[in-house]
Amino acid sequence: MELREINKLCDDLGAKIIKINEYKERGLIPNSGSPYLINEPEVFFTVISVGTAQAKAPEAEKFIARKMGWTKISPSLNKGDFKTPENNYIELKNSFSNKAGCLNLRQIRLWQEVDYYLCVYIDETNIDNSVVLLLTHEQMEEEVAICGSATHGTAAANANNQNIEYSITIKIGSPMMAQWIEKYNAPDIRNQIIGG
């Protein structure tokens, strides 16, 4: 990493801290409790943007589930992450602004009895550029066959493995992303979790 990149990171972090302090002064951030209880999407995603990827993902999951009215389910059910009020099972895949500028879908478990995959890319520099996609289980199977790869292990190591976890990486702004948006864009869900 060069000093130029470090300086940019410091500037970005400084701008986020200023914005967070402004939100606090306006009473948009509670003094205690979990960040996912914040109501305004832009405020929530700005607050968690200063955390690590490992810290952001679970908070974002809780926020999205609360906004959608979904219930967290036990991983032992092998039916994804959440159950909807309509009794559908959802696997949520979220990713945030990153150096590569990609939507990273990791640990796609096609053997699970999931009805839908909700794939969310949060652009932390401009929330309006965020992407929300909804795929059926069958659509995800098709996409994994086209552009997926095993998350762990080699082809030889996975030859006899029936439960292979897959990954898909899509560059934001690429022709592939444009195709996914055309096929799987979920504007109603996007409005609920990110706003219009």
Outline where the language-model segments fall:
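Nucleic-acid endonuclease domains
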Residues: 1-196
